[in-house]
Every structure is written in C-alpha cells, then in structure tokens.
C-alpha cells in the first residue's frame, strides 16, 4: 500500500499509521489524510486514554503483542492496549492510569489486554501485581484475569493477585474494598482482609496476608498524594501525582490554572526527551523529567514573564489524551545550517491556548472540540506563521530510522535565532516500513491474545528451569 499525504499547515501534528510496537517495527498502511476529522459513528478512532510507566526499578521490559520484540521500559512511556510488561527477579515497576496505580513485583508478567475510554482489562500471566483503584467511575471498567480466575471490583479498593507462584494456582487478596472472583466454576464475593485461592477445580477462602511488596505499594500510595494538583486538574489526568513535588500552582485571568516547573530559566518544553512512533497516534513525545507526562499530553504551554508555564485548561472528569500538543514545521524543502552543512530539517513548538490542535490520527469531532475548547483563550489570535515560540529544530534524517529521535543528542542549527520566518508546515515521516508478511503474523498473535473473546488457546508463559517459591506472608 502507499502513503497519501495532503498539504499541511504549520499547526499540523503527528501523522499516524495503524500499527507499531515499542521495538520500533512499524507496518506501512494507508495514512489518514492530515487534519481529517471522522464522524462520531466511525469506529477507527484512537483511544482518548493512555497510561504511563511511572517507576522502573531493576530490569523491566515492555513489548507490544505477545511474541513481539521487547525493549527496556522507560519512565513516562505511554501504556496502551496489548502492551506486555515483564520484570526480572528483584525488579519492580509501576503503571499509572489516572488515579489508578498498578504495580508489578519481581519475576512477573502483566499484559494490558485493553485500555481505552471505557475499559481497563489486564491479564497476569505469572508473578504478583498490586492494584489500587480509588475512583468509583473506574470500578465497572476494571477487570483482571489469570489462567484460573477473573477478578472484578465492586467498589474502590486495593487488591493483590498472585499467579503461578504455586503451579496452576491464583491467589486473590483483597486488602481494601470488595471484589468478585470467578473461577473453577464458582463465583464468590471477597471482602477486605480476605483472599480466594483458585485452582483449576477448587476454590477456597482464607485470610489475606501481606508482605514487603504490599508494604512498598502502600508507601508509594502515601507518598504520591497531590492535594494541590487534584484541585486544579483532578485525579484522572495521568501524571497529576508528580506535579506538586516539582513545581507550583497559580491562577491567571488569561489562562486559568497555571503550573510552573522548577527548571532553569532558559528551559523550553519538548526539548529534553525523545520522539517515538506509537500506534495508533504516530510520533509521540516521551519526556525525561520525572514530572514530564501530564504537561506534555494534556493542556498547553504559555510564557509568563519570560518563563514557561503549563496551562491544563478546564477541569474535566477525564481529559482527552494526546501524543504531543505541538505544531510541526519544516520538511524536505526547508534547509537549515547544521555545523558545516545545510540539511533538510523538521521542527516543532509547543502549542499555546490560542493555537488549534489538528491531529494526524483519527479523532472524533467531539474529542477535538474538547482538546481545543479554551474558555480563557479569547483575547488573542493564534501564533502567526513564522512566530513559533519554543521552536526546536533537528535534521530531517533524524526521523528516518527505526529508533526513537533522542532530542538532546540531535544536532542543532548554527543560527537558531534566524528560524523565525518562512518555515513551511510539515509533519515528520513515519519510520521505516516493516518486512512483508508482518501484518499476517501480527494478526495471528492478536487472535491468540484474545482468548477471553475468541476461545483460542493462549500460549503458555512457563519458563523452564525456574522454580517459583511458595508465598509466605504474615496475616493481616
């Protein structure tokens, strides 16, 4: 198939394709025409919700579908459907999806089978996971499966699930709240302080126990209380919990709530991180700062007294996620001096509240309206062509390979002060095309992954030679 690109304006953002995995293998497909907005009834819309890797301790890997190549997990990496996260013995990791915290202990493998606006479904292949759900709206969306059991919450709470720590056994411990556990032909309600041990043909209840993994998870919850941020942006904006520790809040008559990060005076948004191609959105920003998730996937950036501040916009129950809120400029017909050579270049700049976000992926008109609905941004017009505050420029060839575009390592223009006029609009190209037949292989993998819906047997996740110890946890 071929790519079809329409003419683009300077505010064009992120051309997206249908399939990608974190290992940077990308399937070539027909592209959506840039700026096209789909009717609400069309089903190809990208999710408006994504998670985040918020902590990595030790060796943690993340991959796409089962059988796809994995790569080391990275802080602030977006989490979406069919991601597979695995930890080595002694390692731990944490995922955040709004106010929901998901933590994996060492020697564990967790698959995000479905994550979108209406569902949060997980599958624990082996190991131990701790889940804290604090928002009542998330309760009906949540489901966790193992080989022996299906777990659903009936109220907000905290639970711990162990799979294959004992062979062919799942242990569901409800530490707070209440859960429904289905398995071995039985269905039972498990309340706080109790646990259900499920084998293929046997279910029994017992007292829940705790160990240092549970204590560590509770300590993380207590340390990540963000009272100020929750008042300004709510708790369902993924990454909110980091902001109180790394910046300060204020209120502006022009922009509403503003958050100012603790950074150097010459700091600029979207300059310390990398671009990675993630389906279905396309080029996605992964920031290096520990707080660098919410301010780069929601809201806008403004300059106040020559310093950058983040404006999250109106308070919403669950805001719409974006891969990056930037405008793109440059392309093959725009040459810039880098050291001793003139090279074709691409650049990007943070959108202000007065700039319109135009996605390059499928998005409904209702979500696009929410992304561009700024009640405070009524006094000025959008940035005029050639006036791109915070513009960052790198050689176009940086976007041509399979790997991510690591911005701090990329060459910079010789005369950046001259890059303020005459820059055409153009989004960067997708990465290299995957090998022929990859789409068919991927479809087979997806069918095996959807065992709960298709009935196809899922491949085993046993690893020969590794004996899993029996849990010994003190009673609550």
Residue ranges and their predicted role:
Residues 1-9:
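Bacterial N-terminal signal peptides that target proteins for export
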Residues 1-2, 22, 26, 32-34, ...:
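Intrinsically disordered, low-complexity regions enriched for glutamine and histidine
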Residues 5, 26, 30, 36-38, ...:
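Compositionally biased, intrinsically disordered low-complexity segments enriched
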Residues 10-11, 21:
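Cleavable N-terminal signal peptides
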């Amino acid at each position: 198939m071929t790519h079809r690109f329409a003419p683009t304006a300077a505010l064009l953002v992120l051309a997206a394709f249908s399939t990608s995995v974190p290992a940077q293998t990308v399937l070539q497909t027909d592209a959506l025409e840039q700026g096209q907005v789909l009717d609400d009834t069309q089903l190809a819309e990208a999710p408006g919700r994504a998670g985040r890797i918020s902590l990595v301790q030790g060796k943690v890997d993340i991959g796409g579908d089962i059988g796809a190549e994995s790569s080391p997990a990275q802080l602030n990496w977006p989490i979406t459907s069919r991601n597979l996260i695995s930890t080595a013995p002694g390692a731990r990791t944490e995922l955040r999806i709004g106010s929901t915290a998901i933590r994996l202990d060492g020697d564990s493998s967790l698959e995000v089978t479905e994550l979108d606006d209406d569902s949060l479904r997980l599958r624990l292949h082996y190991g131990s996971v701790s889940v804290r759900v604090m928002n009542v709206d998330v309760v009906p969306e949540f489901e966790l499966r193992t080989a022996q059991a299906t777990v659903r919450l009936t109220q907000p709470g905290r639970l711990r699930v162990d799979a294959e720590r004992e062979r062919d056994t799942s242990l569901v411990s409800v530490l707070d709240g209440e859960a429904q556990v289905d398995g071995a032909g039985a269905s039972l309600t498990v309340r706080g302080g109790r646990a259900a041990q499920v084998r293929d043909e046997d279910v029994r209840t017992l007292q829940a126990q705790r160990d240092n993994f549970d204590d560590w998870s509770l300590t993380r919850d207590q340390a990540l209380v963000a009272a100020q941020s929750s008042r300004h942006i709510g708790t369902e904006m993924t990454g909110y919990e980091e902001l109180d520790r790394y910046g300060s809040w204020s209120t502006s008559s022009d922009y509403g709530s503003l958050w100012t990060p603790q950074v150097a005076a010459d700091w600029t948004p979207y300059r310390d991180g990398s671009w990675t191609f993630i389906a279905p959105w396309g080029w996605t920003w992964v920031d290096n700062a520990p707080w660098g998730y919410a301010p780069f996937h929601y809201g806008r950036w403004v300059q106040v007294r020559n310093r950058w501040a983040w404006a999250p916009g109106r308070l919403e129950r669950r805001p719409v996620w974006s891969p990056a809120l930037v405008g793109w400029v440059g392309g093959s017909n725009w040459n810039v001096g880098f050291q001793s050579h003139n090279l074709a270049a691409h650049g990007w700049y943070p959108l202000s509240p007065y700039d319109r976000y135009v996605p390059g992926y499928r998005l409904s008109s209702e979500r696009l309206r929410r992304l561009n609905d700024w009640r405070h941004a009524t006094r000025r017009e959008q940035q005029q062509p050639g006036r791109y505050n915070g513009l960052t420029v790198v050689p176009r060839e940086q976007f041509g390979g399979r790997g991510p575009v690591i911005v701090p390592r990329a060459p910079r223009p010789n005369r950046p002060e001259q890059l303020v006029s005459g820059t055409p609009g153009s989004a960067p190209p997708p990465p290299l095309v995957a090998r022929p037949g990859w789409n068919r292989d991927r479809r087979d993998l997806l069918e095996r992954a959807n065992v709960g819906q298709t009935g196809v047997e899922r491949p085993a996740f046993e690893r020969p030679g590794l004996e899993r110890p029996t849990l010994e946890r003190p009673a609550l």
